[in-house]
Amino acid sequence: ALGQYMTPAPIAAFMASLFPKNFGAFHLLDAGAGEGSLTCSFLKALRHTDRSFPHGEASLFEYDVDMARKLEKNIIQAVEGLPVKPHIYHTDFIEYASTLVLHKQRLFTHAILNPPYKKISGHSAHRALLRDAGIETVNLYTAFVALSLALLRPGGTLVAIIPRSFCNGAYYRPFRQYILRHSAIRRLHL
């Protein structure tokens, strides 16, 4: 009912490989983290490179209580031996992020996500929060991507799984305009 789709390990590893290879300290955002497969893949990629980084942080959001228990276990194992501090939030990402966007907080250098896919009611609290944050959208996936973009620091990188439906049609025109105003698309993988 939450619109969640889990990311298989090979896809998570591919997504993690898409980040630039040269960066120092980082703060990763994983919105709708599920069991943590995307963040775990990101951290695994860090372990298997020559690059060094002084420290990192990972902020993971998971609303589902059962999923959050698995997430905590997986992330504790994934950060072992790495100078990475995890922050796991059991809260509504849209509520949390829209407040940060309103206060112009740009906290993250990296974002990796497989957002939930579900329509947003035109009269819902989520829709009102998003409008207040300057985001007009009809689906959770576009809301999560737009909020994540808004929370990236200048020069930050977002890697996300999103359906190609955003590419056409009137419903997603505001989302397309938002992407083009606030980011540069460097790579599409179909």
Give the location of each predicted region.
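Class I S-adenosyl-L-methionine
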Residues: 1-51, 59-78, 97, 115, ...
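Conserved proline-anchored active-site loop of SAM-dependent methyltransferases
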Residues: 15, 28-43, 64, 92-96, ...
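Glycine-rich phosphate-binding loop signature in dinucleotide/nucleotide-binding domains
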Residues: 22-23, 102-106
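Conserved Class I SAM-dependent methyltransferase catalytic core
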Residues: 37, 63, 67-70, 137-190
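A short helix->loop->beta-strand "cap" motif at the edges of active sites that frequently abuts
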Residues: 55-56, 156
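Conserved beta-strand segments of alpha/beta enzyme cores
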Residues: 57, 85-87, 184-187
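Conserved SAM-binding strand-loop segment of SAM-dependent methyltransferases
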Residues: 82-93
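Short alpha-helical oligomerization interface
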Residues: 126-134
